[in-house]
Every structure is written in structure tokens, then in C-alpha cells.
A protein has these predicted regions:
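Transmembrane-helix signature of polytopic, membrane-embedded enzymes
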Residues: 1-14, 225-228
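Signature aromatic-anchored transmembrane alpha helix within multi-pass, membrane-resident enzymes
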Residues: 58, 102-105, 171-172, 216-265
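Transmembrane alpha-helix segments characteristic
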Residues: 8-12, 60, 78, 96-106, ...
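Membrane-interface transmembrane helices that cradle and orient dolichyl/undecaprenyl
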Residues: 3, 38-56
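Membrane-embedded, lumen/periplasm-facing catalytic core of multi-pass transferases
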Residues: 235-322
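Hydrophobic/aromatic-rich transmembrane helices and adjacent perimembrane loops
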Residues: 21-22, 28-31, 72, 155, ...
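Aromatic/acidic, Gly/Pro-rich catalytic loop(s) in extracytoplasmic/lumenal soluble domains
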Residues: 172, 216, 341-422
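Transmembrane-lumen/periplasm boundary regions of multi-pass, lipid-linked membrane glycan transferases
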Residues: 65-66, 71-169
Length: 422
């Protein structure tokens, strides 16, 4: 029905997670477009007329080279669906599926040979950055539940899932089963990731919005007013998504000592209490669009555009790439600091502001102390917050407004004697 398609499209274009992906991480957003396109070409397989496998094959190859994990999940769901409804497919069309699969596998084979090694390297990198990451098999159900949690909060409120069994949806069992199978299989495959981020299941966003649009339509099939009211509530607030979690949040806050026994449980507790909060991401998103966002590095870049000179050297203890590209300064790495040639500028905003330093940064701290002791530097405090991480396209940690902090960035300028910065 066209009205269901309209509802699904409206939910998608007003979805803040999807909008953030399309604006700031288009490679993450590509599966949002490719998934419904792939399923559209797949459904034509069940038509009685002669099936053309070329569109499905082309989209599948493109999809694999874009996001192979989500592609694997969608393909797995499609294969399960095809097995369940194989009786509806003609023998001639079914035989063409094998050829399409062989061509896709052949063109994707170069990547398939290196993926196991690549996944191991990625896993090693993440585990080296944090001791809280679970590398055992138990992470699979944990990650699956986490995907359900994030999806419930921002995409599809699972309190409405029982309405998929409405009598009006019985004729749509073929389509509903395809959408559900692909969603579950994407969640399952994505659980292999080291960290369960919503971006790893972005392919499910259009599928879940189609299911949600079906529920909205058939739940109030005879009342457009109630349909509009439900759509407005889903778009403008997270009340339906989060309200069922509020009692659980209140209980968790009263029993917080049970959840703070380990670092992992503590992080899970803080994430749950932060996310289970009534708010309007849609309103916050428009607040972001109507206010200029000032990142933690913006003021620093503007400062050196005015005061920095070409050829001057600079050491910054975090995110040096930004100044290397956007300023005239010559950047110095921490290991290259020496006493005979002190940098013209020193910026402390990240690693060296941390009271607990690792061995490498501790060595750099000793070098900086010696440089400050033997040279004359003027201290300048910029009206810029000390934030080591810039904004993120992940909705859970995205900042809709400019970050603030009581701690400011310290800039040190080497001078021959006492003088003021002009």
C-alpha cells in the first residue's frame, strides 16, 4: 500500500540516527539504501515470469564491497526466507539463483581470503585499547541484546512488536517474515564485532521502519487521525520507545551497588541509565542545525590562523593531524622533542592533561618539563574546552550542541624575553 510506503519513508527521513549517518558518515549510510534495493530485486524472484538475475547480482557485489558484515546478515536472512518459501519459486528461476551466487562469490573472493586475518587484527586492536572488552563466546548474546537495546531506543520500539500478529497483517506474512529474518540475521552476524555499535546494524533501519509503518497503518486502519497521532509521537519523542524502561531504570538506580562490582557491569549500568531517558532527538537535531557547532579544535585552528607563522614548529599532545592540515605550522611528534631545538609552540589539551600517564607519555612529560625549565614560554589560555574526542555520528554519544568544559586549552609560545602576545 502506498500509505505504508509513505509512513516508512517519513520515518526514515526524520530518523536522527539515519540523518547523522547520511550527513557525516555516508559509507555507513550506504547499506540503508542498498538493503531495500537488494530485497526489491530478490522479491521479483517469486514472480511467475522469467527472472532477471543481473540487478540482484550487481547490487550484491556492490553491497559486499561496501559493508561485508551487514551484507552477510542480509544474504543469510534472504537464504532462510528462500528456503521457507521455495515452493513459490519456479524451477527455472531457482536455477538462476545458483548462477547469481557463483558470480557474486567469484568477484568477492579476493576479499574473502583476507577477511579472517583482517577481523583478527581489528579485534586485537580493540582489545589492546581496553581491558573491558569481552573476547569470549559470551560476547555474542551480550552484543545481540545490546543491538536490541539501541534499536528499541532509536528505531523500533519493541513494545509494538506483538502487533505484527494483527489479523490485518496476515496477508503480509511473506513480506513480514522477510523483513524480520533479515533483521535478526544482521543482528546475529554483527554480534561478531568487538563493539556493538548501532552503525553495524544500520542495514536494518529501513526494514524496521517498514515493519513499524505496517503496524501504524493496521493498528488504526480506520482512523487517519490516530495514525497521524502515533506517527507524530514516534517522530517527535522517544516516549513509546523508552517509557517501558523507566521503571527498570528506577529499580537499577536504587540497587546500583549490584551493578558496580566490575568495570564491565559499571559501564553497562551507566549506558542503560543514560539511554533510558525521555527526550526528543528530533528537537535536539534541529537545535544542532540552527546553532553553529563549535568543536574542541575550532578555536585552536582559528588562533593559529592568526598568530601562527609558516615554518614555526609546534607540538600538540593530541590530534596533531588537524593542525598539520589546517595551520601553517610544522608539527613535531612527541618522540622527536629535544632540548637543543625546542618547539615554537606547545599545546596541551589531551594526553599530557591526563593525571595518569602511560610509560610513553611519561617520557614525553619529562622532556616537556625540561624544555619549559630551560626556555622562556608565555602561557595563553584559549576559550576552548579540553576534549580529546571530537563529535561522533553514533547517536548514543553524539553531541548536538557545542561541547563545554571548565578546563581550557593551554597554549605556550616560546619568546626571547618577557613580552605580550599581540
Amino acid at each position: 500500500r502506498k500509505i505504508i510506503a509513505f509512513f516508512a519513508a517519513l520515518l526514515l527521513v526524520t530518523s536522527v540516527p539515519a540523518l547523522l549517518y547520511f550527513r557525516t558518515a555516508r559509507y555507513v549510510a550506504i547499506p540503508i539504501l542498498l538493503t531495500p534495493l537488494l530485497l526489491t530485486f530478490y522479491i521479483t524472484l517469486f514472480d511467475k515470469e522469467k527472472w532477471n538475475p543481473v540487478p540482484l547480482t550487481c547490487v550484491a557485489i556492490l553491497y559486499f564491497h561496501t559493508m561485508y558484515v551487514e551484507f552477510a546478515g542480509v544474504i543469510l536472512g534472504m537464504l532462510i526466507h528462500l528456503f521457507l518459501y521455495r515452493g513459490r519459486v519456479t524451477k527455472d528461476n531457482l536455477s538462476k539463483v545458483k548462477g547469481s551466487a557463483m558470480i557474486t562469490a567469484l568477484l568477492c573472493r579476493p576479499w574473502l581470503t583476507v577477511l579472517p586475518t583482517l577481523m583478527n587484527r581489528i579485534s586485537e586492536f580493540y582489545t589492546s585499547t581496553s581491558s573491558l572488552l569481552d573476547t569470549s563466546w559470551r560476547r555474542l548474546p551480550k552484543h545481540f541484546i545490546t543491538f536490541l537495546f539501541h534499536t528499541n531506543n532509536y528505531i523500533f520500539p519493541f513494545i509494538l512488536a506483538p502487533f505484527l500478529f494483527l489479523s490485518g497483517l496476515k496477508p503480509q506474512r511473506f513480506q513480514v517474515s522477510l523483513l524480520v529474518l533479515c533483521t535478526v540475521s544482521v543482528f546475529a552476524i554483527a554480534s561478531l564485532h568487538s563493539i556493538p555499535l548501532l552503525q553495524y546494524v544500520s542495514a536494518c533501519i529501513p526494514l524496521l521502519f517498514i515493519l513499524l509503518a505496517m503496524i501504524v497503518y493496521y493498528l488504526f486502519e480506520k482512523s487517519m487521525v490516530w495514525q497521524a497521532a502515533l506517527m507524530l509521537t514516534l517522530i517527535a519523542s522517544n516516549f513509546i520507545h523508552v517509557a517501558p524502561l523507566i521503571p527498570l531504570k528506577q529499580w537499577a538506580e536504587l540497587s546500583n551497588e549490584k551493578f558496580l562490582t566490575t568495570g564491565y557491569r559499571g559501564d553497562a549500568y551507566r549506558t542503560f541509565t543514560r539511554e533510558a531517558e525521555l527526550k526528543s532527538e528530533f528537537y535536539q537535531y534541529w537545535q544542532e542545525l540552527s546553532h553553529r557547532y563549535q568543536g574542541p579544535l575550532d578555536e585552536l585552528v582559528r588562533f593559529f590562523e592568526t598568530h601562527g607563522k609558516k615554518g614555526e614548529s609546534c607540538y600538540i599532545d593530541n590530534e596533531s593531524e588537524v593542525l598539520a592540515v589546517l595551520s601553517p605550522l610544522q608539527m613535531i611528534h612527541g618522540e622527536d622533542l629535544n632540548f637543543t631545538s625546542p618547539p615554537d609552540w606547545i599545546v596541551l589539551r589531551g594526553n599530557q592533561r591526563n593525571p595518569h600517564l602511560d610509560a610513553m607519555n611519561l617520557r614525553i612529560r619529562k622532556k616537556l618539563d625540561a624544555i619549559f625549565f630551560n626556555n622562556n614560554y608565555e602561557k595563553i589560555v584559549l576559550n576552548a574546552p579540553v576534549k580529546r574526542i571530537n563529535n561522533s555520528y553514533e547517536i548514543q554519544i553524539h553531541r548536538f550542541r557545542s561541547p563545554t568544559s571548565s578546563k581550557k586549552v593551554h597554549v605556550y609560545r616560546r619568546i626571547a624575553g618577557d613580552s605580550d602576545l599581540s
